[in-house]
Swiss-Prot record:
It comes from Plasmodium falciparum (isolate NF54). This is ADP-ribosylation factor 1. GO terms for biological process: protein transport; vesicle-mediated transport. Belongs to the small GTPase superfamily. Arf family. CDD domains: Arf1_5_like.
Length: 181
């Protein structure tokens, strides 16, 4: 009985450590999202050459978030960050209609990688504050998200500068990572 109570207590209150890989095309808002969630404020960013890594505490999970640069020359290096990834956050600039096909190709290339087969997928349809931004439904269609089978995925409309949708996305991650581990 004591062992059962101890395990239940640990399951309910023990902090979990998870590894999150956050990627997307350049200028999608990845670094802005990372620091808005971490610090609660918008910071001035420059294009990420390489990566940023931060720990974000949310509910009972300690997220180690790897924000990897998205310039086309850097994208082949994304695979070096796949190992032990529990969740993938793919950030899309919803206002960038010209490169949505590039985003789709990058996302589908990643989700077909063996090292990411168990990672859950959260898509942030970012920059929803811009007047010509695609809705989450349109981004879902353009990214062919409905073709993703046997994978747990979710799309969340966001505005990184205002913080809209970010915590809802992390809430989804928390719920599904708790169920998976």
């Amino acid at each position: 009985m004591g062992l059962y109570v101890s395990r239940l207590f640990n399951r309910l209150f023990q902090k979990k450590d998870v590894r999150i890989l956050m990627v997307g095309l350049d200028a999608a808002g990845k670094t802005t999202i990372l620091y808005k969630v971490k610090l609660g404020e918008v910071v001035t960013t420059i294009p990420t050459i390489g990566f940023n890594v931060e720990t974000v505490e949310f509910r009972n999970i300690s997220f180690t978030v790897w924000d990897v640069g998205g310039q086309d020359k850097i994208r082949p290096l994304w695979r070096h960050y796949y190992s032990n990834t529990d969740g993938l956050i793919f950030v899309v600039d919803s206002n960038d209609r010209e490169r949505i096909d590039d985003a789709r190709e990058g996302l589908h290339r990643m989700i077909n990688e063996e090292e990411l087969k168990d990672a859950i997928i959260l898509v942030f349809a970012n920059k929803q504050d811009l007047p010509n931004a695609m809705s989450a439904a349109e981004v879902t269609e353009k990214l062919h998200l409905n073709t993703i089978r046997e994978r747990n995925w979710f799309i969340q409309s966001t505005c990184a500068t205002r913080g809209d949708g970010l915590y809802e996305g992390f809430d989804w991650l928390t719920t599904h990572l708790n169920n998976a581990k």
